[in-house]
Amino acid sequence: MTHVVLFHHVAGLTPGVTALADRWRAAGHEVTAPDLFEGRTFGSVEEGFAFVQSIGGFDEVRSRALAAVTDLPEAVVYAGISMGVVAAQHVAAQRPGAVAGVFLESFVAPEHVGEWPAGAPVQIHGMERDEFFGLEDLEPAREFAAGRDDVDVFTYPGDAHLFVDSSLPSHDPDAAALVDERVLAFLATL
């Protein structure tokens, strides 16, 4: 099967992120979920963002993400949830061998993180009215996908952010189940 590197969101490597990784493992994939916050988790996006600022901002997150994959094979799928998408896109742009990308609840236009590797397919998932994804990232995601048959953008009704994390109050079980179904079908094609 496929080796996936799953970067967590701004609340840290929560039990919900671990559960997501475990579901992908149960489907036969090898999943590495680096802890970029060294064991710290947060109850809100605001608390997590304050921590990110305290360690040097997103530059430090990107540095930690690159360091986390140093000993991994090059041929991996880069996946992320929200802030983790920034890490996934950055690492894939800096390191050869990306097989594919799975971007949950975020997307960053390539001019901000580096070009996505040619030939590596991508799935992008997020809620239509999520203040971060739907109102900021959805348009750049659709622009990125335009004219490409290897990029799929999936939207879900609602406004929750971090809805795929079963350990957070924002979790939407129905939408998260559909994300899992689509991601696992995608990974099975690689």
Regions found by a protein language model. Give the residues of each.
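C-terminal catalytic histidine-bearing segment of alpha/beta-hydrolase fold enzymes
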Residues: D150-L190
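Serine-hydrolase catalytic machinery in alpha/beta-hydrolase-like enzymes
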Residues: M1-P73, V164
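Short beta-strand immediately N-terminal to the catalytic nucleophile in serine-hydrolase-like folds
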Residues: Y78-G80, L104
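Short, proline-enriched alpha-helix->beta-strand connector loops that line the catalytic pocket
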Residues: P117-V122, G147-D150
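Short beta-strand/loop motif that positions the catalytic acidic residue
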Residues: I124-G126, Y156
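Acidic catalytic loop of the alpha/beta-hydrolase fold
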Residues: R129-G134
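Gly/Ala-rich beta-loop-alpha elbow adjacent to hydrolase catalytic centers
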Residues: G80-G84, A88
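A conserved short beta-strand
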Residues: P96-F107
